[in-house]
A protein has these predicted regions:
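PRPP-associated nucleotide enzymes
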Residues: 1-159
């Protein structure tokens, strides 16, 4: 799935020279690193990866003071690809977009997710999807990654 996402990113962006991958903490970061690695293998250039802490920008968690986000040099000419493990309501993505916007004005922002499980509360649609996995509201998708959990696995758990 990640190899296909990497090829789709290359095709849509005519290469990967002006890309920045922004992994949503926690599991989006290793996914972004894996995609960057695949892009580097294909294109001979590995785009940079940053980690996004979206906690202060969430509207569904207790209010936290939003940190001063560092300006990212060259962001103005870049396409930022936000990478996350699971897309559900869209609230994490909205927070990630706000976090990226605080770092500067990207040329474009795109979204890559490993799993799209539906049930959106916001009008957000990913540009790149590893797997569409329709679920019931009372189910939860758990993504386990080698880097964070010691194994690669996706499971659906009833709540």
């Amino acid at each position: 799935a990640l190899t296909r996402i990497a090829f789709e990113i290359i095709e849509k962006n005519h290469g990967c020279r002006n890309l920045l991958l922004a992994g949503v903490h926690t599991r989006g970061v290793p996914l972004a690193e894996r995609i960057a690695q695949k892009l580097g293998e294909v294109e001979g250039f590995r785009p940079p990866v940053i980690a996004l802490d979206i906690g202060p920008f969430r509207d569904d968690l207790p209010h936290q003071e939003a940190p001063v986000m560092p300006d990212i040099p060259g962001l103005a000419g870049c396409t930022v690809v936000i990478v996350d493990d699971v897309l559900y309501t869209g609230r994490s993505v909205r927070a990630a977009i706000e976090a990226v916007s605080r770092m500067g004005r990207a040329a474009r922002i795109q979204l890559a997710v490993l799993i799209d499980r539906g049930h959106r509360e916001l009008p957000i649609r990913p540009d790149y999807v590893g797997k569409n996995l329709p679920t019931a509201q009372n189910e939860r998708v758990q993504v386990h990654l080698r880097e964070t959990d010691g194994r690669d696995q996706v499971t659906i758990v009833k709540q």
